Amino acid sequence: MDFKRVKEYFAWLYYQYQIITCCAVMEPWEQSMLNTIILTIVAMVVYTAYVFIPIHIRLAWEFFSKICGYDSSISN
């Protein structure tokens, strides 16, 4: 895939984003506010997943290992 196709693909994705969020009909300050809100929400979701998913995986591993009889737990 050459650079031109990648650039066109990202342009298409950005166009789809504008259509889905109705950014095409907003004023520039409204677009920046909406983009800021969306970026903030995405950043919070990524941070929360980064912090809490490993903890939940470890707890689930310990829970199911006790149920299945595998008594060795992950040491901290």
UniProtKB/Swiss-Prot annotation:
<protein>
    <recommendedName>
        <fullName>Serine palmitoyltransferase small subunit B</fullName>
    </recommendedName>
</protein>
<feature type="topological domain" description="Cytoplasmic">
    <location>
        <begin position="1"/>
        <end position="11"/>
    </location>
</feature>
<comment type="subunit">
    <text>Component of the serine palmitoyltransferase (SPT) complex, which is composed of SPTLC1, SPTLC2 or SPTLC3 and SPTSSA or SPTSSB. The heterodimer consisting of SPTLC1 and SPTLC2/SPTLC3 forms the catalytic core of the enzyme, while SPTSSA or SPTSSB subunits determine substrate specificity. SPT also interacts with ORMDL proteins, especially ORMDL3, which negatively regulate SPT activity in the presence of ceramides.</text>
</comment>
<dbReference type="Pfam" id="PF11779">
    <property type="entry name" value="SPT_ssu-like"/>
</dbReference>
<keyword id="KW-0256">Endoplasmic reticulum</keyword>
<keyword id="KW-0812">Transmembrane</keyword>
<dbReference type="GO" id="GO:0007029">
    <property type="term" value="P:endoplasmic reticulum organization"/>
</dbReference>
<dbReference type="InterPro" id="IPR024512">
    <property type="entry name" value="Ser_palmitoyltrfase_ssu-like"/>
</dbReference>
<comment type="pathway">
    <text>Lipid metabolism; sphingolipid metabolism.</text>
</comment>
<feature type="transmembrane region" description="Helical">
    <location>
        <begin position="12"/>
        <end position="29"/>
    </location>
</feature>
<dbReference type="GO" id="GO:0046512">
    <property type="term" value="P:sphingosine biosynthetic process"/>
</dbReference>
<keyword id="KW-0746">Sphingolipid metabolism</keyword>
<feature type="topological domain" description="Cytoplasmic">
    <location>
        <begin position="58"/>
        <end position="76"/>
    </location>
</feature>
<dbReference type="GO" id="GO:0017059">
    <property type="term" value="C:serine palmitoyltransferase complex"/>
</dbReference>
<keyword id="KW-0472">Membrane</keyword>
<dbReference type="GO" id="GO:0046513">
    <property type="term" value="P:ceramide biosynthetic process"/>
</dbReference>
<dbReference type="GO" id="GO:0005789">
    <property type="term" value="C:endoplasmic reticulum membrane"/>
</dbReference>
<keyword id="KW-0443">Lipid metabolism</keyword>
<keyword id="KW-1133">Transmembrane helix</keyword>
<feature type="transmembrane region" description="Helical">
    <location>
        <begin position="37"/>
        <end position="57"/>
    </location>
</feature>
<dbReference type="GO" id="GO:0030148">
    <property type="term" value="P:sphingolipid biosynthetic process"/>
</dbReference>
<comment type="similarity">
    <text>Belongs to the SPTSS family. SPTSSB subfamily.</text>
</comment>
<feature type="topological domain" description="Lumenal">
    <location>
        <begin position="30"/>
        <end position="36"/>
    </location>
</feature>
<dbReference type="GO" id="GO:0004758">
    <property type="term" value="F:serine C-palmitoyltransferase activity"/>
</dbReference>
<comment type="function">
    <text>Component of the serine palmitoyltransferase multisubunit enzyme (SPT) that catalyzes the initial and rate-limiting step in sphingolipid biosynthesis by condensing L-serine and activated acyl-CoA (most commonly palmitoyl-CoA) to form long-chain bases. The SPT complex is composed of SPTLC1, SPTLC2 or SPTLC3 and SPTSSA or SPTSSB. Within this complex, the heterodimer consisting of SPTLC1 and SPTLC2/SPTLC3 forms the catalytic core. Within the SPT complex, SPTSSB stimulates the catalytic activity and plays a role in substrate specificity.</text>
</comment>
